């Protein structure tokens, strides 16, 4: 029982009181193997063997630190989103003059996505990624992360100022959205059939729609940002509408996470009523590690979802003040019941293979710190 909140209890279902976003720093052995594979010095099979080995170590460490569900750390990916989206049917990764958003003080590899055919899920390579993770984890619960469907629309149609639709989608954006939602329904069904019961959608579109700067820029290009928010909520709802009752689907909202930098700022208020009030997701992983995320007042629109507070930054290795974190949980509990709140890092530790600016030791100490706080707040 919690001494801080007499009514607070632990959870036995995702999202958990002590949880994670999903990605972890890539070990040096994995970075070396990927580089060697790209140079042709080792085969793809050799790289997969190294990935398997490093994911096995990672899973063991996650169990040791007390996580209730383990991830593969996104060790088989270069980006948190591009690898998945580019492997959809009808989507192609292409070179670009620059990445589709600009991070503070850092440049990302200039790649973007292009829709070249009918969007579908097909026999996506991430199905094998999930199978491998489940095999490594054994009977232990696993969590799997994929980008939200809105990310494909955002990258190809919104950030891209010179979008040229293929004939299939010319003057028919609704068909594109319908095909995209169907692709995700197929994905959810296939992951579920493999045993997945804890799926997370990662989404930076909401971070952009919280930003006054981004909203002004999109408005200047003729985009109705309020309607875009409604479109994305509808797209997500259509994508998850056939979700089985015993499957949890959450969404992580991010403002950018590349080498400890970011690309947008702003509180949740501009999208709160639309997103929190109408999106039928089971839980939200929300960044709240800095002033860039604003206050907790937007949480007043939360209905019966769980809210995982990302109060502990993954962008640096320095530990926060425990009492300050607990006070912020108390603040959030003014808007959402304490038993609808959980705690996690603000984001993953390596949304891209480069990773954030902290050590692996600091990464694990962050998680031990979060577990300790969660036990004080919600009990053991």
Located regions from the model:
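Domain-level signal for soluble alpha/beta catalytic cores
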Residues: 2-380
């Amino acid at each position: 029982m919690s001494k801080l909140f007499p009514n607070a209890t632990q959870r036995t279902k995702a999202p958990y009181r002590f949880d994670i976003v999903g990605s972890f720093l890539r070990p040096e052995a994995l970075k070396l193997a990927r580089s060697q594979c790209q140079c042709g010095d080792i085969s793809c099979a050799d790289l997969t063997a190294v990935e398997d080995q490093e994911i096995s170590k990672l899973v063991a460490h996650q169990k040791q630190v007390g996580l209730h569900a383990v991830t593969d750390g996104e060790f088989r990916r270069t980006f948190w989103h591009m690898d998945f989206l580019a492997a959809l049917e009808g989507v192609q990764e292409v070179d670009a003059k620059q990445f589709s958003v600009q991070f503070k003080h850092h440049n990302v590899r200039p790649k973007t996505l292009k829709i070249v055919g009918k969007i579908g899920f097909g026999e996506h390579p991430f199905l094998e990624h999930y199978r491998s993770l489940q095999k490594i984890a054994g009977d232990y619960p696993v969590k799997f992360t994929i980008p939200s469907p809105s990310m494909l629309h955002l990258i190809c149609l919104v950030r891209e100022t010179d979008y040229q639709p293929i004939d299939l989608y010319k003057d028919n954006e609704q068909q594109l959205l319908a095909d995209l939602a169907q692709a995700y329904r197929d994905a959810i069904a296939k992951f579920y059939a493999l045993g997945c019961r804890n799926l997370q959608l990662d989404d930076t579109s909401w971070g952009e729609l919280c930003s006054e700067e981004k909203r002004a820029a999109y408005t200047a290009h003729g985009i109705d940002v309020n309607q875009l928010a409604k479109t994305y909520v509808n797209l997500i709802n259509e994508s998850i509408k056939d979700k089985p009752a015993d499957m949890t689907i959450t969404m992580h909202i991010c403002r950018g996470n590349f080498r400890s930098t970011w690309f947008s700022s702003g509180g949740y208020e501009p999208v709160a009523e639309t997103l929190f009030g109408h999106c039928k997701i089971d839980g939200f992983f929300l960044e709240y590690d800095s002033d860039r995320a604003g206050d907790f007042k937007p949480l007043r629109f939360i209905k019966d979802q769980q809210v995982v507070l990302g109060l502990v930054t993954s962008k640096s290795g320095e530990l926060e003040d425990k009492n300050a974190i607990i006070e912020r949980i108390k603040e959030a509990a003014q808007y959402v019941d304490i038993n609808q709140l959980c705690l996690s890092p603000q984001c993953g530790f390596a949304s891209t293979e480069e990773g954030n600016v902290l050590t692996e030791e600091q990464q694990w100490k962050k998680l031990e710190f979060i577990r300790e706080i969660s036990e004080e707040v919600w009990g053991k």
